[in-house]
């Protein structure tokens, strides 16, 4: 659980929001700080992309799917695991979905 703007926000044991409807961009900043990440425009691009992906497909993308979808939308420069790991060193799929307020990707350990 975390406290945000005087409210209790329920999370699972790994810090993923239990209710993605409670997510907001200011809350994302707090979640990112807890992950040791200062959100840059490049981070936001991925976070928003992951949220859009979830809204369209009703699932959080695992790393392989994330890389492929990012490459399709933004090109090879951003759609590769090296770029994504520079932004999210503990795992792009795991950290980006957590910061985006989404469930942990199914295929993430």
Swiss-Prot record:
The record's Gene3D superfamilies line, in alphabetical order, gives: 3.30.1420.10, DsrC-like protein, C-terminal domain
The record's NCBIfam families line, in alphabetical order, gives:
dsrC_tusE_dsvC, PRK11508.1
Subunit field text: Interacts with the TusBCD complex. Interacts with MnmA.
Known role: Part of a sulfur-relay system required for 2-thiolation of 5-methylaminomethyl-2-thiouridine (mnm(5)s(2)U) at tRNA wobble positions. Could accept sulfur from TusD.
Assigned EC number: 2.8.1.-
Predominant location category: cytoplasm
Write down what this protein is called: Sulfurtransferase TusE
User: Could you give a GO molecular-function term held by this entry?
Assistant: transferase activity
**Catalytic residues as annotated in Swiss-Prot or TrEMBL:** 108
**What family is this?**
Belongs to the DsrC/TusE family.
What cellular-component terms does GO give this entry?
cytoplasm
Q: Which UniProt keywords apply?
A: Cytoplasm, Transferase, tRNA processing
Q: Which GO annotations describe the biological process of this protein?
A: tRNA wobble position uridine thiolation
Which domain of life does this protein belong to?
Bacteria
Q: Give the source species.
A: Escherichia coli O6:H1 (strain CFT073 / ATCC 700928 / UPEC)
Q: Does the keyword Cytoplasm apply?
A: yes
Subcellular location field: Cytoplasm
The root-end lineage is: Bacteria, Pseudomonadati, Pseudomonadota, Gammaproteobacteria, Enterobacterales
